[in-house]
Swiss-Prot record:
Main subcellular localisation: membrane
Gene that encodes the chain: zupT
Record localization: Cell membrane
Transmembrane parts of this sequence: 6-26, 37-57, 70-90, 125-145, 152-172, 201-221, 248-268
Protein name listed in UniProt: Zinc transporter ZupT
Length: 268
């Protein structure tokens, strides 16, 4: 029960980071591109390292114990790429012109303008928030299940997800703010889109928990690894490189991997 509460709280923490992104947009004067590039790289480094070095092999151990070496290994690989296909399919719901993974600068919230009152623009902003919510749902399941099995890994994933949710929160707020001129409304929809992560945890509790044996755990964990790697390669690293200064994104990746490696060694 204690692990379940911790798993839910960490998932909630990761989801609420989208709202934090909106608050940063309201309060910050300029975007610190060096820090942003480093932080996104750090998040990618943590996700890639923990997925490929720890989560994948824990999934393999669970599945080979249940199915035998050959079938277990095959299913681990299939589930890993299945996780990539799942999150890639979800990303297909996000059109290029409303992609919430495109990093916006906080300066965009400061430019004075008259609200456009364009229903199509407002619809675009709402769809952006909805698309991000759909994208966050499997991340919530991933964070919850990971924490349930190993709180140290769950904590690392929650922090990495939270870091990458902050600029996404800004990305949701900007189009809604330009459509309405209302910062409160922009914050509200950004905040609500992040609640899809704890909703994913609730679904995991209600639907997955009764069936969470070694087979189910191994499949989910392998899919989690695939999802985390896809997010890192498709979202975090391109965004980090876009705002890179003096190789800060690469320093972030290396720092994230080193941080995760030391954490796993200390907790071994």
């Amino acid at each position: 029960m204690d692990n379940m509460l911790l798993a839910f709280l960490l998932t909630l923490f990761a989801g609420l980071a989208t709202g934090v992104g909106s608050l940063i947009a309201f309060m910050a004067k300029t975007t610190n591109t060096k820090f942003l590039s480093f932080a996104l790289g750090l998040s990618a480094g943590v996700m890639i390292y923990v997925s490929m070095v720890d989560i994948f092999f824990k999934a393999k151990d669970a599945l080979t114990a249940y199915l035998g070496d050959t079938q277990g290994y095959w299913l681990t690989v299939i589930a890993f790429f299945g996780g990539m296909l799942l999150i890639g399919f979800i990303d297909r719901f996000i059109p290029k012109y409303t992609n919430p993974h495109e990093v916006k600068k906080v300066e965009d919230m400061k430019k004075p303008h008259q609200p456009l009152r364009d229903p199509d623009l407002m619809k675009m902003g709402l769809f952006t928030a909805l698309a991000l919510a759909i994208h966050n749902f499997p991340e919530g399941i991933a964070t919850f299940v990971s924490t349930l099995h190993d709180p140290s890994i769950g904590l690392a994933i929650a922090i990495a997800v939270a870091i990458h949710n902050i600029p996404e929160g800004i990305a949701v707020s900007v189009p809604i703010y330009y459509a309405t001129g209302d910062r409160k409304k922009a914050f509200k929809y950004s905040f609500l889109s992040g609640l899809a992560e704890p909703l994913g945890a609730i679904v995991a509790i209600l639907i997955l928990m009764p069936f969470l044996n070694d087979l189910m755990f191994g499949i989910i964990f392998a899919m989690v690894a695939g999802i985390m790697v896809f997010i890192s390669l498709d979202e975090l690293l391109p965004a980090a490189r876009k705002y890179d200064e003096a190789h800060m994104s690469m320093y972030g990746v290396i720092s994230g991997m080193a941080l995760m490696a030391v954490s796993l060694l200390l907790l071994a």
